[in-house]
């Protein structure tokens, strides 16, 4: 498996330009499209590359997946147990309280307010991640990635609740 940044010919940094990512992805998809192959072997090879390009693009375009991938490149694998150990008891308590808050909220307008709050939390955390990766501070990057993962869990739970209210 080739490094996703190298595959898409991008600098290996967290703060990537998503428009350039998309442009590179589509250019590479055209270049390695299986239908452009002249031989069966070439077609098979292009199919493998196209599949890797899809994985690379879906990973790098998502802030959380990109952070997890960059940590993985540094041999830091964030499993659920490790993530829980990175957050303080207070942070975990806040997370569970937020889960209960979502569960107990009835009004759609209140759910929208919560959604806005989580979007702000996510953006602040992404900004912290950018700084941590720029400074090559893997400890902070790991902590902020775990926080972002919790925020994403809250956002997913909230989306389910909003759908059930419609």
Swiss-Prot record:
Function of the molecule: Co-chaperone involved in the maturation of iron-sulfur cluster-containing proteins. Seems to help targeting proteins to be folded toward HscA.
Family stated for the protein in its record: Belongs to the HscB family.
Presence of the UniProt keyword Transferase in the record: no
Keyword annotations of the record: Chaperone
Biological process according to GO: [2Fe-2S] cluster assembly; protein complex oligomerization; protein folding
Domain J intervals: 3-73
Lineage top rank: taxon: Bacteria
Any one GO MF annotation of this record: ATPase activator activity
Family annotation (Pfam families): DnaJ, HSCB_C
Biological classification of the source: Bacteria, Pseudomonadati, Pseudomonadota, Alphaproteobacteria, Rickettsiales
Gene giving rise to this polypeptide: hscB
Protein name: Co-chaperone protein HscB homolog
SUPFAM superfamilies, A to Z: Chaperone J-domain, HSC20 (HSCB), C-terminal oligomerisation domain
Quaternary structure annotation from Swiss-Prot or TrEMBL: Interacts with HscA and stimulates its ATPase activity.
């Amino acid at each position: 498996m080739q490094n996703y940044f190298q595959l898409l010919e991008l600098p290996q940094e967290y703060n990537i330009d998503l428009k350039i990512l998309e442009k590179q992805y589509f250019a590479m998809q055209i270049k390695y499209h299986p239908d452009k192959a002249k031989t069966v072997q070439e077609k098979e090879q292009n199919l493998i590359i196209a599949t890797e390009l899809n994985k690379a693009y879906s990973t790098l375009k998502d802030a959380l997946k990109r952070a997890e991938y960059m940590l993985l490149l540094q041999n830091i694998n964030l499993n659920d147990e490790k993530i829980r150990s990175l957050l303080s008891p207070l942070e975990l308590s806040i997370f569970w309280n937020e889960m209960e808050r979502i569960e107990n909220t009835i009004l759609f307008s209140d759910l929208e307010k919560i959604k806005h709050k989580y979007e702000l939390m996510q953006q602040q955390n992404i900004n912290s991640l950018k700084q941590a990766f720029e400074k090559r501070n893997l400890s902070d990057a790991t902590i902020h990635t775990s926080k972002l993962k919790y925020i994403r869990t809250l956002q997913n739970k909230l989306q389910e609740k909003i759908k059930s209210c419609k």
